[in-house]
Structure formats: structure tokens, C-alpha cells
Amino acid sequence: ALGEVTGESARRMVAAAQRHLVVPGAVRSLAPLPVVPPLAVRTDDGDFLNNPNEPYWGRYEGDEDTRRKPAYHNGTAWVWSLPMFCEALVRAWDFSPESVTAARSYLLSMEPLLNEGCLGHLPEVLDGDAPHAQRGCDAQAWSVSEAYRVWKILNCNE
């Protein structure tokens, strides 16, 4: 929905992301839904680290190789992605006043993150599962830069 896909197709994609991926302050890397075809995550020895039919991993914690790495792209919520979702939302609805208001509200869901962890900064990732604990780097530059970039887009006409 950032210009490559427009109209109703873009609106359907944004709505699906809204339903399954968006959490307060971030966007999950994978929805907590069954997948087809199966998506197996294995150890170097070939052992399964997940359920291939339901690969969602909602918590980014534990051992680096057997817990955090598999979770990173299978359910962990990325803070830097939420501003792009907000931009896609307003572009899918041609910057209607309602879409700008909604996008600002989503972007403001990042505000509590500024008051936790490394104060005044945005983290790298959150758990995909509630209560969406902050994880990874406490002060992630591209989380902040994306939030600022999109905030400017949403407020350029004021």
C-alpha cells in the first residue's frame, strides 16, 4: 500500500494487517494463525523448534539459538514497522481525514514505549503476545527515525 498497490486491494491488505499483525506500538512479524504450507524452524541437527503448522512464536526471550532467533521472524513485533503501517493506511485511503486520524492514533500507541526501558527512546522489538514486553535493543535508531518520518507525513498539512 506504499504506492505499488492501490485502491481496494491496498485497503484489504491494510485491514488484514490491522486484524492480525498490529499490536500497540509495533507490528508482528507473523500472525498467530495456522499457515499453509507448513513453516518449519529446525535446529542444525534437523530437530523441530516449532509446530510447522502453527509457527507463531509470541515471546522473544530465552536462549539465543533455540528461542530468540526462531521467534524473531515468527511473531516478534517490530517497532520500526508500525510507522510504515500508518503510512500504508493513509495512502490506501488517499489521505482522507479519517485515515490520518486513525494513523496518528496508531502512531501514538508508541508513546508509552518512550516512558519505559531506555527513557525517550523506542526499542527494537516487543513480544508479539500481550502484554508486549520490550525486548532487544532498548534504543533502536530506525524505530525512532521511522516514527519521526511518518509523523512528519501525517502532520505536513498543519
In which residue ranges do the predicted regions lie?
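Acidic, mature catalytic/reactive cores of soluble proteins
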Residues: 1-158
